[in-house]
Amino acid sequence: TAISAIDIAIWDLMGKLAGKPVFKLLGGRTKEKIPCYYSKLYAGPIDSMQAEAEEAMKKGYVGFKTRFGYGPRDGMAGMRENLKRVEAVREVIGWERDLMLEAYMGWNLDYTKRMIPKLEKFEPRWLEEPVIADDLRGYAELNRGPIPISGGEHEYSLLGCAQLLQEKAVSVLQYDTNRVGGITAAQKINAVAEAHQIPVIPHAGQMHNYHLTMANMNCPISEYFPVFDVEVGNELFYYIFEGDPDADDDGFLQLDDNLPGLGITITDKHLEHFEIEE
Protein backbone atom coordinates (compact mmCIF):
# COMPACT_ATOMS: atom_id res chain seq x y z
CA THR A 1 0.00 0.00 0.00
CA ALA A 2 1.06 3.61 -0.46
CA ILE A 3 1.17 4.29 3.29
CA SER A 4 3.44 1.26 3.73
CA ALA A 5 5.91 2.60 1.17
CA ILE A 6 5.93 6.04 2.77
CA ASP A 7 6.38 4.60 6.25
CA ILE A 8 9.29 2.38 5.18
CA ALA A 9 10.95 5.33 3.45
CA ILE A 10 10.57 7.46 6.60
CA TRP A 11 12.26 4.78 8.73
CA ASP A 12 15.10 4.63 6.20
CA LEU A 13 15.43 8.43 6.38
CA MET A 14 15.34 8.45 10.19
CA GLY A 15 18.13 5.90 10.26
CA LYS A 16 20.24 7.91 7.85
CA LEU A 17 19.70 11.12 9.84
CA ALA A 18 20.56 9.35 13.10
CA GLY A 19 23.52 7.55 11.54
CA LYS A 20 22.14 4.18 12.70
CA PRO A 21 20.70 1.12 10.98
CA VAL A 22 16.94 0.75 11.29
CA PHE A 23 17.21 -2.39 13.42
CA LYS A 24 18.97 -0.33 16.10
CA LEU A 25 16.16 2.22 16.03
CA LEU A 26 13.77 -0.69 16.58
CA GLY A 27 15.57 -1.89 19.68
CA GLY A 28 18.82 -3.43 18.53
CA ARG A 29 20.30 -6.74 17.54
CA THR A 30 18.59 -9.87 18.91
CA LYS A 31 20.64 -12.43 17.01
CA GLU A 32 24.22 -12.64 15.75
CA LYS A 33 22.95 -13.26 12.22
CA ILE A 34 19.65 -14.21 10.63
CA PRO A 35 18.99 -17.83 9.65
CA CYS A 36 17.14 -18.08 6.34
CA TYR A 37 14.91 -20.57 4.62
CA TYR A 38 15.17 -21.10 0.88
CA SER A 39 11.99 -19.95 -0.83
CA LYS A 40 11.72 -21.16 -4.40
CA LEU A 41 11.15 -24.77 -5.55
CA TYR A 42 8.14 -23.97 -7.70
CA ALA A 43 6.19 -27.01 -8.86
CA GLY A 44 7.74 -28.47 -11.98
CA PRO A 45 9.42 -31.63 -13.24
CA ILE A 46 10.48 -33.71 -10.26
CA ASP A 47 14.07 -34.15 -11.42
CA SER A 48 14.44 -30.37 -11.85
CA MET A 49 13.04 -29.72 -8.38
CA GLN A 50 15.40 -32.25 -6.84
CA ALA A 51 18.37 -30.76 -8.68
CA GLU A 52 17.44 -27.30 -7.40
CA ALA A 53 17.07 -28.64 -3.86
CA GLU A 54 20.41 -30.45 -4.06
CA GLU A 55 22.16 -27.25 -5.13
CA ALA A 56 20.45 -25.22 -2.40
CA MET A 57 21.40 -27.81 0.22
CA LYS A 58 25.04 -26.83 -0.28
CA LYS A 59 24.30 -23.33 1.07
CA GLY A 60 23.30 -24.15 4.64
CA TYR A 61 19.68 -22.93 4.68
CA VAL A 62 17.69 -23.94 7.76
CA GLY A 63 14.62 -24.80 5.72
CA PHE A 64 13.18 -25.13 2.23
CA LYS A 65 9.78 -24.06 0.92
CA THR A 66 8.13 -25.63 -2.09
CA ARG A 67 4.91 -24.72 -3.87
CA PHE A 68 2.04 -26.95 -4.93
CA GLY A 69 1.09 -27.08 -8.58
CA TYR A 70 -2.22 -28.92 -8.35
CA GLY A 71 -5.54 -28.14 -6.72
CA PRO A 72 -9.19 -29.21 -6.45
CA ARG A 73 -9.91 -29.27 -10.17
CA ASP A 74 -7.11 -31.81 -10.69
CA GLY A 75 -8.75 -34.45 -8.50
CA MET A 76 -6.96 -37.46 -7.05
CA ALA A 77 -4.41 -37.47 -9.86
CA GLY A 78 -3.38 -33.95 -8.87
CA MET A 79 -3.15 -34.96 -5.23
CA ARG A 80 -0.75 -37.73 -6.18
CA GLU A 81 1.35 -35.30 -8.21
CA ASN A 82 1.50 -32.90 -5.24
CA LEU A 83 2.60 -35.70 -2.93
CA LYS A 84 5.26 -36.94 -5.36
CA ARG A 85 6.90 -33.52 -5.37
CA VAL A 86 6.77 -33.07 -1.61
CA GLU A 87 8.28 -36.53 -1.17
CA ALA A 88 10.99 -35.75 -3.73
CA VAL A 89 12.04 -32.55 -1.95
CA ARG A 90 11.98 -34.19 1.49
CA GLU A 91 14.12 -37.00 0.09
CA VAL A 92 16.80 -34.50 -0.94
CA ILE A 93 16.82 -32.23 2.12
CA GLY A 94 16.52 -35.05 4.65
CA TRP A 95 14.95 -34.73 8.08
CA GLU A 96 17.38 -32.32 9.72
CA ARG A 97 16.07 -29.33 7.73
CA ASP A 98 12.61 -27.82 7.87
CA LEU A 99 10.21 -28.33 4.99
CA MET A 100 7.61 -25.64 4.35
CA LEU A 101 4.66 -26.08 1.99
CA GLU A 102 2.72 -23.34 0.20
CA ALA A 103 -0.62 -23.57 -1.61
CA TYR A 104 -1.02 -19.80 -2.15
CA MET A 105 -4.80 -19.89 -1.61
CA GLY A 106 -5.19 -22.40 -4.44
CA TRP A 107 -7.16 -24.93 -2.44
CA ASN A 108 -10.57 -24.95 -0.78
CA LEU A 109 -11.39 -26.17 2.71
CA ASP A 110 -12.53 -29.65 1.67
CA TYR A 111 -9.48 -30.27 -0.51
CA THR A 112 -7.13 -29.08 2.22
CA LYS A 113 -8.74 -31.37 4.80
CA ARG A 114 -8.22 -34.28 2.41
CA MET A 115 -4.60 -33.34 1.72
CA ILE A 116 -3.43 -32.76 5.29
CA PRO A 117 -3.51 -36.43 6.39
CA LYS A 118 -1.50 -37.33 3.29
CA LEU A 119 1.08 -34.60 4.01
CA GLU A 120 1.45 -35.28 7.72
CA LYS A 121 4.10 -37.98 7.28
CA PHE A 122 6.46 -35.43 5.71
CA GLU A 123 6.42 -33.38 8.95
CA PRO A 124 6.17 -29.92 7.37
CA ARG A 125 6.97 -26.95 9.58
CA TRP A 126 3.88 -25.30 8.19
CA LEU A 127 1.28 -25.30 5.42
CA GLU A 128 1.02 -21.78 4.04
CA GLU A 129 -2.17 -20.08 2.87
CA PRO A 130 -4.08 -23.22 1.91
CA VAL A 131 -7.40 -21.38 1.39
CA ILE A 132 -8.52 -17.88 0.48
CA ALA A 133 -7.21 -15.34 2.97
CA ASP A 134 -10.67 -14.14 4.09
CA ASP A 135 -11.80 -17.58 5.28
CA LEU A 136 -10.97 -16.98 8.94
CA ARG A 137 -13.11 -19.86 10.18
CA GLY A 138 -11.52 -22.20 7.67
CA TYR A 139 -8.04 -21.24 8.81
CA ALA A 140 -9.00 -21.72 12.46
CA GLU A 141 -10.46 -25.16 11.73
CA LEU A 142 -7.38 -26.26 9.80
CA ASN A 143 -5.02 -24.87 12.42
CA ARG A 144 -6.54 -27.21 14.99
CA GLY A 145 -5.22 -30.10 12.91
CA PRO A 146 -1.84 -31.86 12.89
CA ILE A 147 0.01 -29.47 10.55
CA PRO A 148 0.66 -25.85 11.65
CA ILE A 149 -1.02 -23.33 9.37
CA SER A 150 0.72 -20.10 8.38
CA GLY A 151 -0.67 -16.98 6.76
CA GLY A 152 -1.23 -13.27 7.02
CA GLU A 153 0.54 -11.90 3.96
CA HIS A 154 -2.79 -10.75 2.53
CA GLU A 155 -3.85 -8.82 5.62
CA TYR A 156 -3.69 -5.05 5.27
CA SER A 157 -3.85 -3.82 8.84
CA LEU A 158 -3.02 -4.40 12.48
CA LEU A 159 -6.67 -5.30 13.04
CA GLY A 160 -6.65 -8.00 10.37
CA CYS A 161 -3.56 -9.64 11.84
CA ALA A 162 -4.97 -9.33 15.36
CA GLN A 163 -8.11 -11.20 14.26
CA LEU A 164 -5.99 -14.05 12.90
CA LEU A 165 -4.24 -14.31 16.25
CA GLN A 166 -7.36 -13.97 18.38
CA GLU A 167 -9.15 -16.70 16.42
CA LYS A 168 -6.09 -18.99 16.61
CA ALA A 169 -6.23 -19.15 12.82
CA VAL A 170 -2.47 -19.42 12.29
CA SER A 171 0.50 -20.97 14.08
CA VAL A 172 2.94 -18.75 12.17
CA LEU A 173 2.13 -15.14 11.22
CA GLN A 174 3.53 -13.90 7.91
CA TYR A 175 2.37 -10.32 7.44
CA ASP A 176 3.71 -8.39 4.46
CA THR A 177 5.32 -5.13 5.61
CA ASN A 178 4.54 -3.64 2.20
CA ARG A 179 0.83 -4.14 2.84
CA VAL A 180 0.09 -3.78 6.56
CA GLY A 181 1.27 -0.19 6.91
CA GLY A 182 5.04 -0.38 6.90
CA ILE A 183 7.51 -0.84 9.72
CA THR A 184 5.44 1.14 12.24
CA ALA A 185 2.43 -1.17 11.85
CA ALA A 186 4.67 -4.24 11.66
CA GLN A 187 6.17 -3.48 15.07
CA LYS A 188 2.69 -3.22 16.59
CA ILE A 189 1.76 -6.56 15.03
CA ASN A 190 4.96 -8.13 16.35
CA ALA A 191 3.99 -7.15 19.89
CA VAL A 192 0.48 -8.59 19.55
CA ALA A 193 1.85 -11.83 18.06
CA GLU A 194 4.38 -12.20 20.84
CA ALA A 195 1.60 -11.79 23.40
CA HIS A 196 -0.19 -14.70 21.69
CA GLN A 197 3.06 -16.71 21.56
CA ILE A 198 2.87 -16.91 17.77
CA PRO A 199 6.16 -16.51 15.87
CA VAL A 200 6.37 -13.94 13.08
CA ILE A 201 8.20 -14.61 9.83
CA PRO A 202 7.49 -11.66 7.50
CA HIS A 203 6.48 -12.47 3.95
CA ALA A 204 9.29 -12.28 1.38
CA GLY A 205 12.85 -11.20 1.90
CA GLN A 206 13.53 -7.49 1.41
CA MET A 207 15.71 -5.34 3.58
CA HIS A 208 13.01 -3.83 5.78
CA ASN A 209 11.93 -7.34 6.78
CA TYR A 210 15.51 -8.28 7.67
CA HIS A 211 15.72 -5.28 9.99
CA LEU A 212 12.44 -6.28 11.66
CA THR A 213 13.66 -9.86 12.07
CA MET A 214 16.99 -8.75 13.49
CA ALA A 215 15.29 -6.49 16.06
CA ASN A 216 12.63 -8.95 17.27
CA MET A 217 13.13 -12.09 19.34
CA ASN A 218 9.79 -13.36 18.10
CA CYS A 219 11.01 -13.37 14.47
CA PRO A 220 13.19 -16.51 14.36
CA ILE A 221 14.10 -16.76 10.66
CA SER A 222 13.74 -14.90 7.36
CA GLU A 223 12.34 -15.94 4.01
CA TYR A 224 15.02 -15.73 1.31
CA PHE A 225 14.38 -15.65 -2.43
CA PRO A 226 17.52 -16.56 -4.39
CA VAL A 227 17.82 -14.45 -7.51
CA PHE A 228 17.84 -16.51 -10.70
CA ASP A 229 16.09 -14.35 -13.27
CA VAL A 230 13.93 -11.27 -13.28
CA GLU A 231 10.64 -12.26 -11.68
CA VAL A 232 8.15 -9.43 -11.49
CA GLY A 233 7.01 -9.69 -7.90
CA ASN A 234 9.07 -11.07 -5.07
CA GLU A 235 12.42 -10.48 -6.74
CA LEU A 236 11.89 -7.29 -8.71
CA PHE A 237 13.21 -5.12 -5.89
CA TYR A 238 16.62 -6.80 -6.19
CA TYR A 239 16.95 -5.12 -9.58
CA ILE A 240 15.86 -1.69 -8.36
CA PHE A 241 17.86 -1.50 -5.13
CA GLU A 242 21.36 -2.62 -4.27
CA GLY A 243 22.82 -3.42 -0.89
CA ASP A 244 20.78 -6.48 0.11
CA PRO A 245 22.93 -9.01 1.96
CA ASP A 246 23.52 -12.39 0.34
CA ALA A 247 22.52 -15.59 2.11
CA ASP A 248 23.93 -17.88 -0.55
CA ASP A 249 27.24 -18.41 1.22
CA ASP A 250 26.03 -20.16 4.37
CA GLY A 251 22.27 -19.71 4.58
CA PHE A 252 22.51 -16.78 6.99
CA LEU A 253 22.15 -13.01 6.55
CA GLN A 254 24.18 -10.36 8.31
CA LEU A 255 23.28 -6.70 8.79
CA ASP A 256 25.96 -4.05 9.15
CA ASP A 257 25.94 -2.28 12.53
CA ASN A 258 27.47 0.81 10.92
CA LEU A 259 25.31 1.15 7.80
CA PRO A 260 22.60 3.78 8.44
CA GLY A 261 18.97 3.42 7.45
CA LEU A 262 17.94 0.28 5.64
CA GLY A 263 21.33 0.05 3.97
CA ILE A 264 20.10 0.03 0.37
CA THR A 265 20.28 2.52 -2.49
CA ILE A 266 18.49 2.86 -5.83
CA THR A 267 20.43 1.56 -8.83
CA ASP A 268 19.95 1.65 -12.60
CA LYS A 269 22.61 -0.91 -13.48
CA HIS A 270 20.03 -3.60 -14.26
CA LEU A 271 18.03 -1.57 -16.76
CA GLU A 272 19.17 -3.84 -19.59
CA HIS A 273 17.09 -6.63 -18.04
CA PHE A 274 13.88 -4.69 -18.66
CA GLU A 275 12.08 -3.91 -21.88
CA ILE A 276 10.29 -0.57 -21.69
CA GLU A 277 7.34 -0.04 -24.03
CA GLU A 278 5.84 3.38 -24.64
Feature annotation, model-predicted:
Residues 1, 17-29:
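Short, flexible active-site-proximal loops enriched in glycine and acidic residues
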Residues 21, 35, 98, 148, ...:
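Proline-centered loop/turn at the N-terminus of a beta-strand
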Residues 235-278:
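C-terminal extensions of enzymes
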Residues 123, 134-148, 152-252:
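Shared catalytic-loop signature of beta/alpha-barrel
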Residues 38-40, 66-68, 101-105, 129-131, ...:
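A cross-domain feature marking catalytic cores of carbohydrate-active enzymes
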Residues 1-17:
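Metal- or metallocofactor-binding catalytic centers and their adjacent structured scaffolds
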Residues 33-141, 145:
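Metal-dependent enolase-superfamily TIM-barrel catalytic cores that perform enediolate-based chemistry
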